[in-house]
């Protein structure tokens, strides 16, 4: 439509110019000099018409819709009066869309537009109101926050469950002794340990070495200490059971909402085996119409006959030989029957 209006306006101007020229011609032809030479006379109306035609050619047709539209929207830089917009002209000047300079120019313009939009959003009160409404009405999701709720629960546990098992106590006591020995070696305070080893050497060790005796002494001491700990813990447990048989514990329990199971997307090529499967060769097995009929009497075409030969394990050359032998035998029998009639 715009191109039609652009093309239409100059036509109107040209038509007016033609009319003015025709009128000028008529005036020159109508008035002649005394010598019979035509004299050219200029009318004021002609000059006005020429001015109008020039103005109509120079400007975009003011009476047309395009002229009215451009008159009101000339201040907008995004609207181009010609064939290309300013941005398109700049891209063409840089060598087209596929050049590096044009791409850089487009990214710069995009970044400039993004910054301008951000500034307008910060200044806009309506945008802030919309953002606040979205924050209020958004539902809790996995990224925003936890899906579970906090509940306080009372759990009643008997004191027997808090007792340390014997094996764990032995490991702890051995570890404590090893740490004490290491500290003593570091600070060179080995007197209490040497006395303990001497006391253990007086005990019957049955011809063991010094290291084995030391280990036996340690094990015996550990056993004694463990027994003492057991007795002490039992006594303390009895006292606790007398005072408070059960103990209440308050703890925070989080009940998570059931999340939907994530669907595992599988590609159809994942189900295929790594090595290509061998295609089973086609073979005819069992009794069929082909196996019931004789090879020579088989009514099918050559391809089916060949397939029948392969299924039976017969090669075509052998089959042709068999048919020839049968034909020869049949011909001999016929000749033997015909021979007695001649005599």
Curated annotation (Swiss-Prot):
Coiled coil ranges: none
Pfam family, one: DUF5520
Bias type Basic and acidic residues, positions: 16-27, 229-247
Top-level taxonomic group: Eukaryota
Alphabetical list of InterPro entries matching this protein: DUF5520
Record region (Disordered): 1-27, 205-247
Bias (Acidic residues): 219-228
Function: Dispensable for normal development and fertility.
Protein name as annotated: Uncharacterized protein C10orf120 homolog
Organism: Bos taurus (Bovine)
């Amino acid at each position: 439509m715009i191109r039609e209006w652009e093309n239409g306006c100059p036509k109107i101007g040209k038509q007016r110019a033609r009319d003015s020229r025709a009128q000028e011609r008529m005036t020159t032809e109508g008035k002649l000099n005394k010598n019979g030479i035509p004299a050219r006379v200029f009318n004021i109306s002609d000059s006005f018409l020429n001015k109008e035609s020039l103005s109509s050619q120079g400007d975009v047709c003011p009476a047309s819709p395009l002229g009215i539209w451009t008159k009101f929207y000339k201040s907008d830089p995004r609207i181009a009066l010609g064939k290309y917009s300013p941005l398109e002209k700049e891209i063409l000047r840089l060598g087209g869309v596929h050049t590096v300079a044009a791409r850089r120019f487009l990214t710069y313009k995009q970044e400039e537009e993004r910054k301008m939009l951000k500034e307008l959003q910060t200044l806009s009160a309506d945008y802030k109101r919309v953002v606040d409404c979205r924050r209020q009405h958004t539902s809790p999701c996995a990224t925003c926050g936890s899906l579970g709720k906090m509940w306080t629960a009372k759990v009643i546990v008997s004191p027997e469950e808090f007792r340390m098992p014997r094996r764990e106590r032995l490991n702890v006591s051995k570890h404590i002794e090893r740490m004490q020995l290491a500290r003593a070696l570091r600070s060179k305070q080995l007197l209490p340990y040497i006395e303990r080893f001497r006391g253990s050497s007086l005990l019957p060790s049955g011809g063991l070495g010094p290291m084995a005796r030391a280990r036996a002494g340690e094990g015996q001491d550990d056993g004694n200490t463990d027994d003492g700990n057991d007795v002490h813990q039992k006594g303390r447990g009895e006292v606790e059971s007398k005072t408070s048989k059960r103990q209440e514990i308050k703890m925070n329990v989080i009940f998570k909402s059931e999340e939907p199971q994530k669907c595992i997307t599988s590609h159809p090529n994942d189900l295929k085996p790594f090595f290509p499967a061998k295609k089973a060769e086609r073979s005819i097995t069992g009794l069929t119409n082909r196996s019931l009929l004789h090879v020579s009497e088989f009514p099918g075409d050559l391809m089916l006959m060949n397939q029948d030969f392969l299924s039976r394990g017969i090669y075509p050359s052998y089959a042709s030989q068999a048919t020839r032998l049968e034909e020869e035998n049949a011909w001999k029998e016929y000749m033997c029957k015909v021979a007695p009639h001649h005599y």
